[in-house]
């Protein structure tokens, strides 16, 4: 599938505004490789925008060569678009991956035959933009299969004390914890919980750093009072973020299936 937008204004890509979206750029080679390979594994549909974006075509990422730092894309159906992509100054790829907007900028593409299949080949991008603000979507933890978080705090005498709290909700940007009110002094804003163990059903245990952003008190259905401790992830590697996003997407699919009567 291909198209042009002759009568439409040029698309405005977030990747062209690093000053506004700096926190969403991934530049570490390992993270770039991880997401490129994830696009291949998922068979994600990408839109390849040529130069200013008025001409574009749909494609998929067929393979990634980490050693040669090259990506292989399915060619466009129209030969003129393949030629335009080869002669372009830049190519902007856009996609959605588990509710997250992905953008990356490629140099001009070249044609290459791989096992008799015509492909478009480009070098690895220098950065990947992944946009998911925390407020976009939060998943409430299931009471049947709760997410647990083990927190380690340093006591005044220098020893470590550990607590295991239920996660109330989780997103790609952070989570909320249910904690006893007796620990309110340990859960003040900007408190940092390093190497917390996040046990996500079906995914495994992740080590995460959490910074407290907000603490409030609430009453549970049983009448007891608890703290709701809102935290953000700090320096979360892309591979661990992908596990969290995969869990969120899976639970949402299961809930939608139950709501539509497709699952018991």
Swiss-Prot record:
<keyword id="KW-0973">c-di-GMP</keyword>
<dbReference type="GO" id="GO:0035438">
    <property type="term" value="F:cyclic-di-GMP binding"/>
</dbReference>
<keyword id="KW-0547">Nucleotide-binding</keyword>
<dbReference type="Pfam" id="PF07317">
    <property type="entry name" value="PilZN"/>
</dbReference>
<keyword id="KW-0975">Bacterial flagellum</keyword>
<dbReference type="InterPro" id="IPR009875">
    <property type="entry name" value="PilZ_domain"/>
</dbReference>
<dbReference type="GO" id="GO:0009425">
    <property type="term" value="C:bacterial-type flagellum basal body"/>
</dbReference>
<comment type="similarity">
    <text>Belongs to the YcgR family.</text>
</comment>
<dbReference type="InterPro" id="IPR023787">
    <property type="entry name" value="T3SS_YcgR"/>
</dbReference>
<protein>
    <recommendedName>
        <fullName>Flagellar brake protein YcgR 1</fullName>
    </recommendedName>
</protein>
<dbReference type="InterPro" id="IPR009926">
    <property type="entry name" value="T3SS_YcgR_PilZN"/>
</dbReference>
<dbReference type="GO" id="GO:0071973">
    <property type="term" value="P:bacterial-type flagellum-dependent cell motility"/>
</dbReference>
<dbReference type="GO" id="GO:0071945">
    <property type="term" value="P:regulation of bacterial-type flagellum-dependent cell motility by regulation of motor speed"/>
</dbReference>
<comment type="function">
    <text>Acts as a flagellar brake, regulating swimming and swarming in a bis-(3'-5') cyclic diguanylic acid (c-di-GMP)-dependent manner. Binds 1 c-di-GMP dimer per subunit. Increasing levels of c-di-GMP lead to decreased motility.</text>
</comment>
<feature type="domain" description="PilZ">
    <location>
        <begin position="132"/>
        <end position="249"/>
    </location>
</feature>
<comment type="subunit">
    <text>Monomer. Interacts with the flagellar basal bodies.</text>
</comment>
<dbReference type="Pfam" id="PF07238">
    <property type="entry name" value="PilZ"/>
</dbReference>
<dbReference type="InterPro" id="IPR012349">
    <property type="entry name" value="Split_barrel_FMN-bd"/>
</dbReference>
